[in-house]
C-alpha cells in the first residue's frame, strides 16, 4: 500500500541546527528536508508534526509546510483542518483555569523543583504561553519523579522525557533534556493513534520519525519508526530502549538528513 502519513518530531529531527528547516546538524545549508517534504507531496502522503511546542508555534510550522493537521504540547492535543481534539482525559479547561493553571495551582512544579533542586527548571522562554502542559529542562530520573507524584496522590499527572536539547545548565553535567508535565493519559503515541483513526489511516501505512524516548513510543502506533542518528548519540536512555522494538530503524543521517533517509527509504520499499 502507498505511504499514507509521516509523523515527525520537529526539534532535533525534521529541523537542523538552530531549529532551521534549511540547516543540517552542523549548521550547513541543506535542502534534504524540503526534498523529503516534496516527495511526500508527490505521492499524497500527509506529514504531521508531533511536537512538544505550544499550539501557535506548531500551527505556524505546519502552515509553512502546507499541512493542515498537527500534534502539539507533547501529545496533549491534535488538530485537523481547524478542529482540535484534546487527549488529556478527565483533565480539561474549566472555571478553575487552563490545565496549565490547574497544575500550577496544585503546586506540582514547585514540588518538582524542590525535589530536584538545581537539576530541573522551566525551559525559559518556551514555557510561556502554554495551556495544557508545563515544560522544563534539566536532568532528572523520570521514574523517580513519577513515583513522587504517585506518593502525593498526584498520579493523574506524569513527567515525560522529550529528549536531549542543546540548552546547558551550569548545575547539570552533560546534556540537558526537555521534560513535560502532562495529564497521565497524554503521550505522542496516543495522539498519533488518535489522529490516524480520525483520518482513517491504517497504522501499517504510516511511519514516524523522532529523536527521544517519548518519540520512540510512537513505534507502537505506526508500521515503522525511524530514530535519527543524533538521538541515540546524545541520549543513553534512548539507546537502552531501542532493543525492545522490532519495527525501529536508526538512520545513518542526523536530524533532517535522517528524516530524508526515513522518507525516501519508505517510499522506495513501497514502489
List the predicted regions and their residue ranges.
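Glycine-rich phosphate-binding "P-loop"
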Residues: 14-27, 176-183
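Short active-site oxyanion
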Residues: 42-48, 67-68, 133, 203-206, ...
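Charged, glycine/proline-rich intrinsically disordered loops and linkers
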Residues: 86-106, 160-177, 236-243
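Conserved acidic, metal-coordinating active-site core of Asp-based
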Residues: 114-222
